[in-house]
Amino acid sequence: MSLQGQIALVTGASRGIGRGIATELGKQGVIVVGTATTQKGADAISEYMNASDIKGCGLALNVLDATQIEQTLSVIKSKYGEVSILINNAGITRDNLLVRMSEEEWDDVLATNLKSVFRLSRAVLRPMMKARQGRIINISSVIGSTGNPGQANYAASKAGLIGFSKSLAREIGSRNITVNCIAPGFIETDMTEAMSAEQREKLLRDVPLQRLGQVSDIAAAVVFLAGVSAAYITGATLHVNGGLHME
């Protein structure tokens, strides 16, 4: 599937990994629609796309709202056409030890990180099946494979994405639609930039490559899985973590 002229929907695209993915896809000639939870965030997406000469726009979307999802896809269809690449990147954390974790903290994370992926994927499937091509790429996490104290909800949601992707890949492979996961490790972000040297050293102790990942590392993996070179890859999880977790 050539990337030129394809239409991508990238959730959680106002900053960080989502912004990097949207930008890199745009550089490859993809029409990109990035979403944010607020109009301010959506406007910021449109601004950086315009500044980088990327065709597309930002839209406000609450990924928990099924009606908004349908409305957003309708807007995209009227402006650009049907979505052919879906990047499920939006996610949240609500960290707490399980003994103290509230039902709300559990439900919020599972709804945003997993149920929204079910809804968005289901919503784009019929047009992809009709076109007999498509890419669905779900952004999981190394935590989904390793677990982490205080993140049982987050780990469950990210592990769930891996099982979801494998199952969906088996369902729709005959329609030439691939479904894959990318599982980032520790990525350089505003939060990691604020770490002390001691905290950073501790973080990198178990990373063989001895550095944090860059947003560009994740974006490059997305471009690969979205493109023609990955046409025979489906149901896979690509771990981009500097060797922190190996399979």
What is each of the regions a protein language model found here?
Residues 126, 170-174, 231:
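Alpha-helical segment proximal to the catalytic Tyr-Lys
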Residues 141:
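Residue(s) in the substrate-gating loop at a strand-loop-helix junction
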Residues 7, 14-16:
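Conserved glycine-rich cofactor-binding loop
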Residues 173, 178, 233-235, 241:
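Short, small/polar-rich loop/turn modules that mediate ligand/substrate recognition or access, typified
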Residues 121, 157, 165:
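Active-site helix of classical SDR
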Residues 28-44:
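Conserved glycine-rich Rossmann-like NAD(P)H-binding loop of the short-chain dehydrogenase/reductase
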Residues 97-98, 102-110, 192, 203:
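Substrate-binding pocket helix/loop in short-chain dehydrogenase/reductase
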